[in-house]
């Protein structure tokens, strides 16, 4: 076939025949009148940087095959397979032959496939699988790396180090599994502390710096067994976590590998072999340039473009399209949060179930022990012929505890609510009946009152009725406008005068001092949590560092602490630093460092040669009176004692003036009291009634007790010290301030009361005058009706005199105040 006018006359069809027609048309279109019909039919793809293009030289044009030039167009055949699989060698060859050389080659090609008709005779020898029925319905899905043990693998270099260096002269040897566990722990710790170690491998941390991170428990990977054992309380001592002395074996989980079953705990391995193994591992880490010593499989990470990297395994075949909306992300994140919450809830429930079963097991074991003890007691009682008192040896039936479930609790709440509703309905019905009875009685009363009013209204005149209505309206309005009666001694709101009990000044100062101490303790505890066992606070130890202190005899006023930030009243002459205090006390310490008051290290020739006068601190022994070490007495004395948990404390006893017994005996005669108590030889003397014992204890208390500390007043006496006045003056000033405030508020209340009283008297006068005028008008109208005078006559009304009204009000106010006084 040939193309006419460069137009494409063939149609797109499926099959090798149509492919041959299309290829022939393409060839004829190229060889025809010069029109490129293939270019109009085929869409050229964009040239990619990753695609390899073949370069043809001018000398190679005459030797090129036309089929090779049109290779891209010849492959445009509907194969029915995916685009990525069209490049397969056998399929590619078949497509070329089917499209171009089908009429020349009668032999058909096919894609080779393995012959699956035959069976392998040695299959049972290598694949002997047996189905084992599972014991639980809970399944888990984890990777092989999570269940096959530690990821580190021992090689020849590690084996040589383990045999020739580490285990050469040691009795308790480190096996290969424990060595791999240590190296894996090192790898995990370095990943956490130094994630960018490949930038500079020489800066790898030392063993002492990595040790706190190694001792932390990794609950998500290797120490899940220890966590479960601690939470269930099955293993109290982590050193016996893998011991099977109980007969029950170690506490294992599904995630534990069989290779790590007999491995000792990581803290024990770190203490015994950690330093030597870490030095060997760090050398290999530096040789690997900070990367992993054993290369791991490189997987495809989401969000990273690693399409060119040939070492990425298990690459996904589909294209990752960019996500343009955030709605799906929000929904997925919410689902993940809900899933995480449910998983945590399931974990807590499983741990609680494990704890419950552990407690039940412990109860059963205790019952068995009690039974054995009872049997032993019964045998002993039979041997000794002891009868009776056998109730303790009988196992009484225990009452089954009532378990309050959620359903029972809900039923009880519903019953209570129904009872409340029934009671309320009964009360409402009774109230409705009472209201109906009251309404009936009120209606009858109203009818009687209305009849009486009709009779009285007929007797009275219409004009008098209008006047009385106006007066009653004005009176009601005046009563509504009148405020509530006030009194001088009425209790005002708490916002103006606080209704509180004034506390003692000493109590307030003590509370302030307690709050300051509590604040300091909370800050120290918070700082300890922030350090996270990575830093050690040496200031908590009274022995290390040791200071040679001298106290100031007096404190000047400008340098005295007037706030919570107190300046130091101690002057440090020399300070000492040593690693081990016991070696120093035994006299064998050699690494003692001495610093002067400026913080500079003293390295004189005398000290370098071992001058003990500079390096040695004096130790005072109060029981060794024969050999005194001091020419003068220390301002403070120390006492060493052991407290709870075998914690050593160093107490400080301040030097105070001893209270003389003679001064105390000036007030109390001890001999007379002792003679008086010795006279009562007939009866035993109670300790609480002994006056001699009471006064002797009081004397001992006065010897060592003092209301002040060793440096003067308490820090809580700050208000008086800030104002440069005494504490008594500060108390008087505070009381005067409260008195003036209360006096001002009392004065305001008195003025307000007088104003209300004057306005009330004025209103009463006005109402009385209005009533008098109304009565005069009524009398005048009655006289007119009796005499038969015309209705248009007017009655003279006396106007209200304001001046007289003011005088009357003033006189009433004076009389009222005199009565109050």
Curated annotation (Swiss-Prot):
Q: What GO terms in the biological process aspect are recorded for it? A: DNA repair; positive regulation of macroautophagy; regulation of transcription by RNA polymerase II
Keyword Nucleus included in the entry's annotation:
yes
The protein's location, in the record's own words, is: Nucleus
Entry similarity comment: Belongs to the enhancer of polycomb family.
What does the entry list under GO cellular component?
A: NuA4 histone acetyltransferase complex; nucleosome; nucleus; piccolo histone acetyltransferase complex
Function (record text)? Component of the NuA4 histone acetyltransferase complex which is involved in transcriptional activation of selected genes principally by acetylation of nucleosomal histone H4 and H2A. The NuA4 complex is also involved in DNA repair. Involved in gene silencing by neighboring heterochromatin, blockage of the silencing spreading along the chromosome, and required for cell cycle progression through G2/M.
Name-wise, this protein is Enhancer of polycomb-like protein 1
How does this polypeptide assemble, per the annotation? Component of the NuA4 histone acetyltransferase complex.
A GO molecular function held by the record: histone acetyltransferase activity
Membrane spanning stretches: none
Region Disordered, annotated ranges: 1-43, 427-485, 779-799
Q: Which Pfam families match?
A: EPL1 (PF10513)
Residue ranges under compositional bias (Low complexity)? 18-39, 449-465
Question: InterPro entries, alphabetically?
Answer: Enhancer_polycomb, Enhancer_polycomb-like_N
Keywords (A to Z) from UniProt = Cell cycle, DNA damage, DNA repair, Nucleus, Transcription, Transcription regulation
- Give me the stretches of Polar residues compositional bias: 1-12, 786-799
